[in-house]
Amino acid sequence: MSVWDSISFNNRFTALPRLFYTPIQPTPLNNVQWLAWNHNLANELGFPSFECTSEELLETLSGNVEPEQFSPVAMKYAGHQFGSYNPDLGDGRGLLLAQVVAKSGETFDLHLKGAGKTPYSRMGDGRAVIRSTVREYLCSEAMAGLNIPTTRALAMMTSDTPVYREKQEWGALLVRAAESHIRFGHFEHLFYTNQLAEHKLLADKVIEWHFPECLDDDKPYAAMFNQIVDRTAEMVALWQANGFAHGVMNTDNMSIIGQTFDYGPFAFLDEYDPRLICNHSDYQGRYAFNQQPRIGLWNLSALAHSLSPLVDKADLEAALEQYEPQMNGYFSQLMRRKLGLLSKHEGDSRLFESMFELMSQNKVDYPRFFRTLSNLDTLLPQDVIDLVIDREAAKLWVDNYLQRCELEESSVAERCEKMRQVNPKYILRNYLAQLAIDKAERGDSSDIDALMVVLADPYAEHPDYEHLAALPPEWGKAMEISCSS
């Protein structure tokens, strides 16, 4: 019996008209081998347990053999890239292989990245390399561990097929799993090409599949947009609170269901720098860390324009006006949790602002600062102060923080226990990802395996992996990453 016979399929996207996609077969790579298999996610999706030895799964997920349940397609969409509309986008190196029903009953896309040329590849070769594949695999699972909405990564495979970027590299494959691959750019494409019947059909399907609570609303499309605004606001707030810089927030990289999507030149903050630009192609800093909330609104405005045939202008504007207060509300709530403050008090905003000023002016390590605060049940206030160059300013802030904590009903021990559940000890620092890539390119997945342990539960101590909580070496600070993959 085939392994696929034990899995339920729901290939609903390919039931849409052909103008939404192009059927196409993956182009096989040479001598494909497993690099990683995500056992936890595989179990959630209903795959049988195995130790990366299934030849059938390797052959089918790599695209070498097509099971009868698969119907691989390249999706068509458009999008605004660095603020300019580009109509010529689509899945240029990835294919939606199939949609499976997880144990939870939710439908998940299985998407193969690096599958070869498609009609939307433009000048590209349709391939991915080990470098970018490892980064997405690790980061999507790191985000899941931080409880940030995200696509997931099921598997990685390597090959002997040469791929040429700045130098020769080796072709690799990533199997991504997500509840949806529908992007803001799907609606933009249909709107700008005046395919309004199909545009409405897509909106109907998005509501049916992802926002069924909107079906009974008097204005279902407006209700859908409200949901998208809210989910995007929460996602961006989670990015900011956790120090995540996406790097390339084009509208074709924005998920319609508010999941972090398309990991490329991302970074997690080491030293706190609100102006961090992690994408070396972002010459103007459009997607700098501190610009992400503004760009979230810009992208939603672009989506709103493309939804204008379905939603009244007043309803679109009303939803957009809610984005900033929603995002700020989510962010304030997250910062209170990170600081162990369960109640709201006047002056909290100033406490946050002065904290960020202190960290920015003194290049304080962002995750280390919050994790140290979380351990004040066993550490001294001086341990927090010692993280900061300007000790006098640090002491002033710590004194103000401890005075604010006195307004809480919880004990220090209770407060710190809760803080350790939201302030990770382990994050995917870029230098750790690079070390894992270097080993993976030599056929060694041990660093990937170790990182997957701590990233799955980044709040635990993991004493055997203490070295993965180390601050970056000089070469690993403020790394700028290329979009090339």
Swiss-Prot record:
It is an enzyme of class 2 (transferase). One of its GO terms (molecular function) is magnesium ion binding. Belongs to the SELO family. PANTHER family: PROTEIN ADENYLYLTRANSFERASE SELO, MITOCHONDRIAL. It catalyses: L-seryl-[protein] + ATP = 3-O-(5'-adenylyl)-L-seryl-[protein] + diphosphate; L-threonyl-[protein] + ATP = 3-O-(5'-adenylyl)-L-threonyl-[protein] + diphosphate; L-tyrosyl-[protein] + ATP = O-(5'-adenylyl)-L-tyrosyl-[protein] + diphosphate; L-histidyl-[protein] + UTP = N(tele)-(5'-uridylyl)-L-histidyl-[protein] + diphosphate. Nucleotidyltransferase involved in the post-translational modification of proteins. It can catalyze the addition of adenosine monophosphate (AMP) or uridine monophosphate (UMP) to a protein, resulting in modifications known as AMPylation and UMPylation. Mg(2+) binds at residues 253, 262. It comes from the Bacteria. ATP binds at residues 90, 92-93, 113, 125-126, 176, 183, 262. This is Protein nucleotidyltransferase YdiU.
